[in-house]
Amino acid sequence: MAMATRTLGFVLPTSLSSQPSFDRRGGGFRVSVIRCSTSPLTFPTSGVVEKPWTSYNARLVLEDGSIWPAKSFGAPGTRIAELVFNTSLTGYQEILTDPSYAGQFVLMTNPQIGNTGVNPDDEESGQCFLTGLVIRNLSISTSNWRCTKTLADYLTERDIMGVYDLDTRAITRRLREDGSLIGVLSTEQSKTDDELLQMSRSWDIVGIDLISDVSCKSPYEWVDKTNAEWDFNTNSRDGKSYKVIAYDFGIKQNILRRLSSYGCQITVVPSTFPAAEALKMNPDGILFSNGPGDPSAVPYAVETVKELLGKVPVYGICMGHQLLGQALGGKTFKMKFGHHGGNHPVRNNRTGQVEISAQNHNYAVDPASLPGGVEVTHVNLNDGSCAGLSFPEMNVMSLQYHPEASPGPHDSDNAFREFIELMKRSKQSS
């Protein structure tokens, strides 16, 4: 009978190639249990496991006057941002690297974060854009075959603050009842609570152009370097190629990945790229991407959208949806606490079907302000807010949520096929 081997403790592999394998000599399995961690756990004489990260006393001070003692991980210092909560159970690395979170602290309602570490494949952009991460418990151990480092090390390297050991459930209830709040995270004991409170009350995220901080600086051709295992819904394609210009207001990699998988050749352009220059490139369609902040803070983007309407088919996602709403003559407004998570039910008004969607936005389009001919195609079933638009006369479609997910369900991936069909019909009629 074959003997199973077991590795005890925590191994620091430079390569995570070790896998459970079949032992042909003995007819059984040889099992190795691997834990990825940048530092081994130690067991002092007290029997308490020491945390493998540097921790400081920290505070979260909110503009409503509440003070939440915490422990820190990641970078030390003092930062100010808007606090929002995210209800996703998984995908914290995608959330960390989503440019739409620029200017915000993200509180995860899932009580245990960090279990799977981080890896290069799950990033949605080249850096972390959120200001800080707020969690209940930071996992002591990290276990995943793709893991290359711990969450604490990852945040430290990117100069992002993280705090844990707070009552995140109580904070979430406060945000749900009172709305999003400006807060200050600090590890600096020399600063008084009153000083931090005054900081939180002297700053506002409304009206700030955050898109210019996250957009690319020059156009580039997007080449998908992702493992083919990411792909799905391959039977939905017609084998044709479509040239798409993607306006980068804070675009996520998986939006580009999904477009590419449907046969699109993508040129990504900055948020300030002139509409006339975009049209000179003779695209089959234009995508207006997701992005952070207030759509009213970027009138230059609204003007660009207006200039492109009716010229080629356009597709807006999240911020792109809001900019389209304004360009069509509608108004946007700031929501009480926004939608952030991977479990939001949305009804497709055309089919009656309900999709579970990934969402991340603090603003919404007021459907009552839209002109005639603009159809509200999707509605959020939690609060009845507008979740999708269509204006067939100008070949316009948009979604307030994220059909590419990452993280989140894939219920809405069909929206990319609908954009392909929109471009296809436009080419056939021209």
Curated annotation (Swiss-Prot):
Gene Ontology terms: cellular component: carbamoyl-phosphate synthase complex; chloroplast; chloroplast stroma
Range annotated as the organelle transit peptide: 1-35
Phenotype of gene-disrupted mutants: Reduced plant size. Reticulate leaves with reduced number of palissade mesophyll cells.
Classification via InterPro entries: CarbamoylP_synth_ssu, CarbamoylP_synth_ssu_N, CarbP_synth_ssu_N_sf, Class_I_gatase-like, CPSase_GATase1, GATASE
GO molecular function: ATP binding; carbamoyl-phosphate synthase (glutamine-hydrolyzing) activity; glutaminase activity
Entry-linked SMART domains: CPSase_sm_chain
Pfam family, one: CPSase_sm_chain
Catalytic activity: hydrogencarbonate + L-glutamine + 2 ATP + H2O = carbamoyl phosphate + L-glutamate + 2 ADP + phosphate + 2 H(+)
UniProt pathway: Amino-acid biosynthesis; L-arginine biosynthesis; carbamoyl phosphate from bicarbonate: step 1/1; Pyrimidine metabolism; UMP biosynthesis via de novo pathway; (S)-dihydroorotate from bicarbonate: step 1/3
Key words, A-Z: Amino-acid biosynthesis, Arginine biosynthesis, ATP-binding, Chloroplast, Glutamine amidotransferase, Ligase, Nucleotide-binding, Plastid, Pyrimidine biosynthesis, Transit peptide
Family: Belongs to the CarA family.
Assembly and binders: Heterodimer composed of 2 chains; the small (or glutamine) chain promotes the hydrolysis of glutamine to ammonia, which is used by the large (or ammonia) chain to synthesize carbamoyl phosphate.
Entry protein name: Carbamoyl phosphate synthase small chain, chloroplastic
The species this protein was found in: Arabidopsis thaliana (Mouse-ear cress)
Encoding gene per record: CARA
